[in-house]
């Protein structure tokens, strides 16, 4: 059976399920009004109606270019040319009297520009938003981080983890149920190499490894770099790696026991590191358990039964189980095995490839193998949540564990270099389970993180003049070249602490440290999230440590400013409740919005109230940068508001109530957006 690799296939076809939300945003409500008007006027059902937000409020709050599409439809139906502007005029008349709309204009060749009733919109935006209803109707499994448990995690791993964690937060913000998985490749080459290092370079026994009292993942970082040099000195030593891999896959013996200890201890270090930036996990599935619990064997048999794979009997892949590509698939035959047209699932030496094990794991994710792991607690977080780890030992199974797997969809955060094998993983899963769950699943690809030349030199690496002229230099674990996450956080916290101590000497040491930590996390997470997933990041210490401009601390400071406003108002005995605004008539609110500075005030309200639209756009595109950009925009808008309007000294009670309401909305939405980004604003900065 030939499996077609469709290079034009969209991994993002799943977001259709989010387009019928019960809790409608302002854009969706207005879109429905327009859709109903089109049905009444022209008896046409339009499934998709595009809506735009004009760049300036004087041009309207929403713009609908739908008249152009209607003109085409009507011409096709009647054979007569239709004027889009005339169609737009009829639509404008139809929706002009709808509640919530203040004015409708026709602009240009046929745009319908809608101006909202600002007073009505503001009063509806002041109360807390209602809970969001989930749309998918099942659990989404998000797999992220998945750092090889062989050494300390670096900044490139953190981009994966922060993207994944933010995706989880995005999905939960629109009401979805999410299970967070961190797949542990404890039988791969990287773990095997560290085992070789301990056994054949340091010549340590398991007890001696257990006795290492320095930071264990850092020790392994240095050792891993030594192993690369160890192989370079004598290529025959690579046989040690091959032998070790076989022993790891066997799942027993001294070498396996040593590798199991190393991988679990390093994994514990990774969880501690990720917790520093607010990242937690539900379950830690281990690759060794995929192999030893017959999960791979069950999947292997299904793949053979469905004709998805076949045994190659000739050529250089003879003896391998491969997934055949379609004849028309355009792949260079000279490429390495990882990217050749016929994807190897089991090598001729019997070793299952990463792709093969991944297919099995994803079939389990969707509940297609009628088999499960055993589970035991591995790490308990301070909030009581437990990170469970898989095991093959039924005696270790804790029956209190939640039900894992059996998802309605899965999303994998894996770097863009794995796009080709990930395509085959999905094709393998589709060969067994070709339904909506697979269609809704996606590979969240992202570009890697490189280092600026200045950063490399700060790490103590010598560069040639040619390297110094380059914009970015790739990290290399085998060379020990990279920025460890813990080191980076330490530097960020130290820098932030200096500023906090200078500005707030009255705070206790504990409060200063907590504030510095929140600022450091805000700076780091925002730096990694403000770039779109397909943008390569050239990591630079100076830029990451900056607190001005488009940075996390800049946005955090906006919340701090809003909080300070409410503290001062409370100290002055001024009412800041929603009831204060309710005492102001809609007519008076409309006057204030129509008066001097009214457009600026409205633009802040309107931008703040569009958070839900922004979240839905981010979920539909699986792009956290959309939220990051929105947060920065509203922080800019609010800081301008803060400088231009002085609430405490405002003599007009109605105007003051309006300014308080706007501050409350902006603060609430900023805090909500930062929470989705995994950032918390400190009380003071």
Each PLM stretch: what is its role?
Residues 127-135:
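Flexible, low-complexity linker/hinge segments
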